């Protein structure tokens, strides 16, 4: 079975079995809603068990969650540093023009049919995602995911067409 990361447990929160999670999902309300089923993976990325979300709330930059049946700090303290993942078949469908990160990472980036590089990471610094493009013999290129820069994403062809606006590439 294939799984995709939705967050990492960074600490416990209080004594009642709550955990602080750093989310890596754009769908936190859906992923962490009561009754949602996720897989727990240890710090060596080994499957541990499936868990069900009992509660979810936001606190500062964290998602605070509690697992069903684990209502005390002693039951969950061992999970610090573990990852929460969703099974591929539970991801759900996206609207036209929306993509999961795992679909974007690894795509080749072209500007006017000239290969620029390959997307190696996606950052979330603010209003827009930023795609990190690994280039040969140059520093990584940071591309904001905005319509004037990212012109076309073709998952089937493993290709992204972009227009690198002046000022985005400091090596030109």
UniProtKB/Swiss-Prot annotation:
Domain of life of the source: Bacteria
This protein's UniProt keywords: Chaperone, Cytoplasm, Ribosome biogenesis, rRNA processing
Record-stated family: Belongs to the RimM family.
GO biological process: ribosomal small subunit biogenesis; rRNA processing
Subcellular location: Cytoplasm
InterPro entries reported in the protein's UniProt record: PRC-brl_dom, PRC_barrel-like_sf, RimM, RimM_N, RimM_N_sf, Transl_B-barrel_sf
Domain comment quoted from the record: The PRC barrel domain binds ribosomal protein uS19.
Summary of subunit composition and partner proteins: Binds ribosomal protein uS19.
Protein name as annotated: Ribosome maturation factor RimM
Signal peptide coordinates: none
GO cellular component: cytoplasm; ribosome
Function: An accessory protein needed during the final step in the assembly of 30S ribosomal subunit, possibly for assembly of the head region. Essential for efficient processing of 16S rRNA. May be needed both before and after RbfA during the maturation of 16S rRNA. It has affinity for free ribosomal 30S subunits but not for 70S ribosomes.
GO molecular function: ribosome binding
SUPFAM superfamilies, alphabetized: PRC-barrel domain, Translation proteins
Stretches assigned to the PRC barrel domain: 95-168
GN (gene name): rimM
């Amino acid at each position: 079975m294939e799984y995709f990361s939705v967050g990492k447990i960074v600490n416990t929160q209080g004594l009642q079995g709550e955990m602080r999670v750093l989310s890596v999902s754009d769908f936190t309300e859906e992923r962490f809603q009561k009754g949602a089923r996720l897989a727990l993976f240890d710090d060596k990325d080994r499957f541990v068990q499936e868990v069900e979300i009992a509660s979810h709330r936001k606190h500062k930059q964290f998602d605070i969650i509690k697992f069903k049946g684990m209502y005390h700090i002693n039951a969950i303290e061992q999970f610090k540093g573990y990852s929460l993942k969703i099974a591929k078949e539970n991801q759900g469908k996206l609207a036209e023009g929306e993509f999961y990160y795992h679909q974007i990472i690894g795509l080749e980036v072209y500007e006017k049919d000239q290969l620029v590089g390959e997307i190696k990471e996606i950052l979330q610094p603010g209003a827009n995602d930023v795609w990190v493009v690994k280039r040969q013999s140059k520093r990584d290129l940071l591309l904001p995911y905005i319509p004037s820069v990212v012109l076309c994403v073709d998952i089937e062809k493993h290709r992204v067409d972009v227009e690198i606006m002046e000022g985005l590439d400091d090596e030109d």
